[in-house]
């Protein structure tokens, strides 16, 4: 086992990365190795998808499957070895379909790619796990050096984050053949084990550039299905009655669940990255969508254990449900999986509803605590003139974008301290589950109107923040980096990595990121990123605030 993709990975004097019987996330060595094998098979699939496109051959099923299966290897998504092995087998089935299609144009087609002809040594999990060891992601690290290896992983993990957003868009009927072509190009290239540092950095930015279009596509899918988010108050305290908790990112699953539970006397609560759902008109109209429960994903074992109903995980982040003894009432959907947990293949939530009715539910209604969400792209852009007026009047000095992933490191209290210590003439635009560090605090308003805390949505709604910045830049006639706007990113896994690469690809400078640097990037690479893009790690809220204001003075 070698896995170094998330913030919680092992860091020791002997080296970084989880490399024993189990990762810090709870993933077994077997599952981790099988994920490496799956990635190798996906490299092969993409290599042939690139070749097939030379003849105008597009296999839509393969195009959809590839990023979806890659998503399964994201942190805290799928811990089920059998399903990972199944994805590897399916990847080669699609690969072989592409080879057959190319054979209509070439007799005995070949491909100059190290993984073009990879085959699996059987079908059993045990056999595949043994084979998988040769595809560990650190096999050539000593040969190519820490810097090149780290930036290659930056590309791989960034592309993994983009693949997740591609899958989120696809379930909302949004896809683009040009984006699929770019994805396959990057995935095929990564399978050749590239080691030129300059090329790797260029590709990292190109992956970020592609992801901007993916996020735009996802934004279109969400707004076309559910309407443009509008500011809305959300109760974060329990309401008496039977209940279901839904977590993850898949708003379509939530819509289906709301339809199927309507009139059944069951209250539905959002959790984690589902919180922004309360701002979408086509979701908030359901009266039994009563509120949000819990906090960041890392607290789920305690919070899910005391939630008296059924739970649905639609995407990341899932951790071991056996710890809190709720494995019998949690259900996985889509690409998510945990051994022994009931997986729902389709949108039939009958088992979830039955379980919710069996459970006790909340015995009484607690006193309301309301927070505000719903500051999506359209709302933010519509407010751009008001923001400019406040800036010109000297009432709004700076906007801080504080968002990204949450996690359980003590150092993450930095984000709470920073947000709460900011001057009253500043605003905080937040997105992703990092918001749970401060979104229940009262930040008040600026000049009695603009809320100082603006929740723009899920991590992929970085697109909304970017479009606000672009709009302000155009209206003020200044560059993006001249705006009184700064980004303090909270990273944990691969979605945050691709968000960072997207920002860098757009030319955004001086991003602050933490609470610690990725374990796969050494100090030399971090120094290079600081030199090229102004990327900085975190120190203290006071010191970083001083640097930010000093640069924008």
Curated annotation (Swiss-Prot):
Binding sites annotated in the UniProt record for [2Fe-2S] cluster: 3, 6, 18, 25
Gene Ontology biological process: response to hydrogen peroxide
Catalytic class of the enzyme: oxidoreductase
Any one cellular-component term (Gene Ontology): cytoplasm
Xref: Pfam families: Prismane (PF03063)
Modified-residue entries (Cysteine persulfide), positions: 405
Compartments where found: Cytoplasm
Cofactor-binding details, from the entry: Binds 1 [2Fe-2S] cluster.
The keyword Metal-binding appears for this protein: yes
Keywords per UniProt: 2Fe-2S, Cytoplasm, Iron, Iron-sulfur, Metal-binding, Oxidoreductase
Top-rank taxon: Bacteria
Cofactor(s) this protein cannot do without: [2Fe-2S] cluster; hybrid [4Fe-2O-2S] cluster
GO molecular function, one term: hydroxylamine reductase activity
Enzyme Commission identifier(s): 1.7.99.1
Residues that coordinate or bind hybrid [4Fe-2O-2S] cluster: 249, 273, 317, 405, 433, 459, 493, 495
Keyword Transport attributed: no
Catalytic reaction list: A + NH4(+) + H2O = hydroxylamine + AH2 + H(+)
Disulfide pattern: none
Cross-referenced SUPFAM superfamilies: Prismane protein-like (SSF56821)
Function text: Catalyzes the reduction of hydroxylamine to form NH(3) and H(2)O.
Family statement drawn from the similarity comment of this UniProt entry: Belongs to the HCP family.
Protein name: Hydroxylamine reductase
Origin species: Actinobacillus succinogenes (strain ATCC 55618 / DSM 22257 / CCUG 43843 / 130Z)
């Amino acid at each position: 086992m070698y896995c170094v993709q998330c913030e919680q990975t092992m860091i020791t004097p002997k080296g970084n990365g989880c490399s024993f019987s189990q990762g810090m996330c709870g993933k077994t060595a077997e599952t981790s190795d099988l994920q490496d094998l799956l990635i190798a098979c996906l490299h092969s699939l993409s290599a042939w998808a690139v070749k097939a496109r030379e003849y105008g051959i597009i296999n839509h099923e393969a195009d959809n499957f590839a990023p979806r299966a890659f998503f399964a290897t994201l942190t805290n998504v799928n811990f089920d070895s059998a399903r990972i092995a199944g994805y590897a087998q399916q990847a080669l089935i699609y690969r072989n379909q592409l080879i057959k299609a190319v054979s209509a144009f070439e007799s005995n087609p070949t491909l100059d790619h190290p993984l073009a002809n990879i085959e699996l040594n059987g079908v059993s999990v045990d056999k595949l796990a043994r084979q998988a060891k040769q595809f560990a992601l650190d096999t050539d690290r000593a040969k190519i050096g820490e810097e090149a290896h780290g930036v290659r992983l930056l590309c791989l993990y960034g592309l993994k984050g983009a693949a997740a957003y591609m899958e989120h868009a696809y379930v909302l009927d949004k896809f683009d053949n040009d984006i699929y072509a770019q994805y396959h190009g990057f995935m095929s290239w990564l399978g050749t084990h590239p080691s030129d540092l300059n090329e790797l950095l260029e590709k990292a930015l190109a992956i970020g550039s592609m992801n901007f279009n993916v996020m735009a596509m996802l934004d279109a899918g969400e707004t076309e299905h559910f309407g443009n988010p509008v500011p809305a108050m959300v109760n974060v305290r329990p309401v008496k009655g039977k209940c279901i908790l839904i977590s993850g990112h898949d708003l379509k699953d939530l819509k289906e669940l709301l339809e199927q539970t309507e009139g059944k006397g069951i209250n539905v609560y959002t959790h984690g990255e589902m919180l922004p759902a309360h701002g979408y008109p086509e979701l908030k109209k359901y009266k039994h969508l009563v509120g949000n429960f819990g906090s960041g994903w890392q607290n789920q074992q305690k919070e899910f254990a005391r939630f008296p109903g059924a739970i649905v995980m639609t995407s990341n982040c899932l951790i071991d449900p056996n710890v809190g003894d709720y494995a019998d009432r949690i259900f996985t959907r889509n690409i998510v999986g945990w051994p022994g947990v009931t997986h729902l293949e389709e949108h039939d939530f009958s088992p979830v509803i039955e379980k919710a009715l069996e459970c006790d539910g909340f015995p009484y209604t607690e006193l309301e605590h309301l927070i505000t969400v719903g500051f999506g792209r359209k709302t933010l852009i519509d407010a751009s003139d008001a923001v400019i007026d406040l800036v010109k009047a000297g009432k709004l000095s700076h906007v801080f974008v504080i968002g990204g992933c949450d996690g359980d490191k003590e150092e993450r209290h930095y984000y709470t301290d920073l947000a709460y210590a900011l001057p009253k003439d500043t605003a905080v635009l937040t997105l992703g589950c990092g918001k749970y560090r401060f979104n229940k605090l009262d930040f008040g308003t600026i000049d009695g109107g603009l809320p100082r805390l603006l929740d723009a949505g899920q991590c992929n709604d970085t697109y909304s923040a970017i479009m606000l910045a672009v709009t302000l830049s155009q209206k003020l006639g200044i560059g993006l980096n001249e705006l009184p706007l700064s980004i303090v990113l909270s990273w944990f896994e691969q979605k945050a990595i691709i968000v960072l690469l997207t920002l860098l690809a757009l030319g955004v400078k001086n991003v602050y990121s933490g609470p610690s640097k990725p374990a796969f990037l050494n100090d030399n690479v971090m120094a290079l990123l600081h030199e090229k893009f102004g990327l900085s790690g975190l120190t203290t809220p006071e010191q970083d605030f001083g640097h930010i204001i000093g640069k924008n003075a």
